[in-house]
């Protein structure tokens, strides 16, 4: 385990140059007995494995190994509060666009401080940006590159004075 501030990824890696990163955002909640319980960890890890498969990442991490990584990082950070975990797999090589290995794994666990809009009404704007299509860049996988779509829509909405953006498919639905 490397401290967050010491973790590095080369600027010419596939992860940085091409957005070849997949991840899961996972929540852990502090129970009445003072123990953290990770919400639907097996499901998150299976989706991460699916994302890596679709992105053709060459790796053989089992759900058991990934569970151990998450557990070890939570313990190392000595967290005793609701926690956000970000487990990422990324192309580490400085190779070309088609690089599928080596793959590195990063896991960050930090206290969860929601800035949720649940306690107030949100003002939303239908964006001029369209939701990406599954046949182009599958939004069902959590690939960092896919988030540029929502990022552009959010920037537009906030610039225009709204809290959130609503993205419609190309068909307008």
Regions found by a protein language model. Give the residues of each.
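Short, internal active-site loops enriched in acidic
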Residues: 90-95
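ATP-grasp fold ATP-binding core
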Residues: 82-89
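Helix-start/capping segments and mature chain N-termini
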Residues: 1-61, 65-72, 76, 96-173
């Amino acid at each position: 385990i490397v401290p967050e501030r010491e973790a590095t990824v080369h600027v010419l890696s596939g992860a940085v140059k091409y957005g070849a990163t997949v991840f899961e955002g996972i929540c852990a909640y502090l129970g009445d007995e003072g123990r953290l319980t990770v919400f639907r960890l097996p499901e998150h890890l299976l989706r991460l494995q699916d994302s890596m498969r679709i992105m053709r990442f060459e790796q053989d991490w089992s759900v058991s190994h990934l569970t151990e990584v998450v557990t070890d990082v939570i313990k190392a950070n000595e967290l005793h509060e609701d926690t956000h975990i970000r487990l990422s797999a990324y192309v580490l090589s400085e190779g070309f666009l088609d690089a599928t290995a080596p793959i590195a794994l990063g896991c960050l666990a930090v206290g969860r401080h929601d800035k949720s809009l649940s306690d107030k009404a949100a003002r939303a704007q239908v964006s001029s940006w369209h939701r990406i299509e599954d046949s182009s860049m599958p939004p069902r996988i959590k690939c960092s590159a896919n988030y540029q779509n929502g990022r552009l829509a959010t920037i537009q909405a906030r610039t225009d004075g709204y809290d959130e953006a609503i993205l419609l498919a190309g068909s307008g639905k």
